[in-house]
């Protein structure tokens, strides 16, 4: 894994000392097919999808729970070494490129 807890520099609009949580991420097995299956299932249940993301180290499916908390299902790219993943994550400051669900392989 490239990280267990990621501390990322906040954007300028962040209010210092405010209480909050950006999101909680849950790592999954099953690859991009599992992300597509979860996406379809969440939509079928009426869950609000935020976005699908290519993080360069893996793919994420962001959505909101009934209380408005932002959650993520995350699949890490296979065969990515810890060092490679940390380098990508560090150099790009947690890369996040929004993609369409159809772009998943």
What are these model-derived regions, one by one?
Residues 1-19, 64, 70-78:
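Conserved short beta-strand elements that form part of the metal-binding/catalytic scaffold
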Residues 2-3, 22-23, 55:
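Histidine-centered active-site/metal-ligand motif
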Residues 8, 27, 52:
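A cross-family glycoside hydrolase active-site/sugar-binding cleft signature
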Residues 13-105:
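Vicinal oxygen chelate
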